[in-house]
Amino acid sequence: MILKRISILNYKNLEQVEIGFSAKLNCFFGQNGMGKTNLLDAVYFLSFCKSSGNPIDSQNIRHEQDFFVIQGFYEAEDGTPEEIYCGMKRRSKKQFKRNKKEYSRFSDHIGFLPLVMVSPADSELIAGGSDERRRFMDVVISQYDKEYLEALIRYNKALAQRNTLLKSEFPVEEELFLVWEEMMAQAGEIVFRKREAFIEEFIPIFQSFYSFISQDKEQVGLSYDSHARDASLLEVLKQSRERDKIMGFSLRGIHKDELNMLLGDFPIKKEGSQGQNKTYLVALKLAQFDFLKRTGQTVPLLLLDDIFDKLDASRVEQIVKLVAGDNFGQIFITDTNREHLDRILQKVGSDYKVFRVDQGVINEMGAEQ
């Protein structure tokens, strides 16, 4: 899928944007805070029905405005045009449409426009809690497996209901707990099996990308831990119930799964330098792209936001070789350093566009500039 053109009104600091894109490489340069990331976030919104950063939709409306609109005009591999519309008014329900037909459920759209975004916020995958790493798995698997997404939604709904019962000041019958625990167990087993299968297939792809970028300087790995691995999830929940009542929430279940990120045999969170951490995250996301490309029906979009920060020259050069090659589809890349972008352009050839971003205004630059 190729994003041919985007139209934006009042999204964050982008007052009015109308630009057409290259089918291969689109470069955006400008100082920090000018709107480069906001443009990528608008593209992300069209794939996931939400911002990559701020989940509160109304807070993404431009200051002193009452609404935002994002429209993307795409072209499928067979030439079929696709129009995606998102509109949000303050104190109103968000609208999401494909070819002017509104979705009844946002989850029906997930996976239609597969996308991978590499951004500075990815540092939370290493530094943050286990929920960040579970979200990474969820974002990947949900884009190619509808059964996974539906099971995850069912599990989270049942988890919320069980937690409500756990907080109750009055006695709750066991049968009522069992209703939600059985739903959690049934949906949770599906989520567990699909996460486990994904990680097993994903690890060698990830290791291959890391080895290329680092030029085999370090060994990395991933391991997946879950309460569902060694026992029936229903039994795990039942056995934990009395302790959960004391705590007021569910201590065990697939919502506590962990994806361990390793440098050698140790957690990269404790062992990794800034450059190693950044290499790890870039390799993780490029592997995500490669995995989705293999499993899906269409090549994902790739958004690279400030990707070269904290990397030494040799690792920057390896990433340039990767993204300039033929294995990636349409790419959107931002940087404050025009020289980084020019090095990529020299390797790509003629199919690219360069844009300057300044105070929310985006202008395409001529080839001679």
Curated annotation (Swiss-Prot):
Single annotated GO MF: ATP binding
GO biological process: one example: double-strand break repair
DNA damage found in the keyword field: yes
Subcellular location: Cytoplasm
Pfam families per UniProt: SMC_N (PF02463)
Keywords, comma-separated and alphabetical: ATP-binding, Cytoplasm, DNA damage, DNA repair, DNA replication, DNA-binding, Nucleotide-binding, SOS response
Binding site for ATP: G30, Q31, N32, G33, M34, G35, K36, T37
Major localization listed first in the record, in broad terms: cytoplasm
A GO CC term assigned to this protein in UniProt: cytoplasm
Disulfide links within the chain: none
PROSITE patterns in UniProt: RECF_1 (PS00617), RECF_2 (PS00618)
Keyword ATP-binding attached: yes
NCBIfam families: recf (TIGR00611)
Function according to Swiss-Prot or TrEMBL: The RecF protein is involved in DNA metabolism; it is required for DNA replication and normal SOS inducibility. RecF binds preferentially to single-stranded, linear DNA. It also seems to bind ATP.
UniProt record similarity statement: Belongs to the RecF family.
Protein name per Swiss-Prot or TrEMBL: DNA replication and repair protein RecF
Organism: Bacteroides thetaiotaomicron (strain ATCC 29148 / DSM 2079 / JCM 5827 / CCUG 10774 / NCTC 10582 / VPI-5482 / E50)
Gene from which this protein is expressed: recF
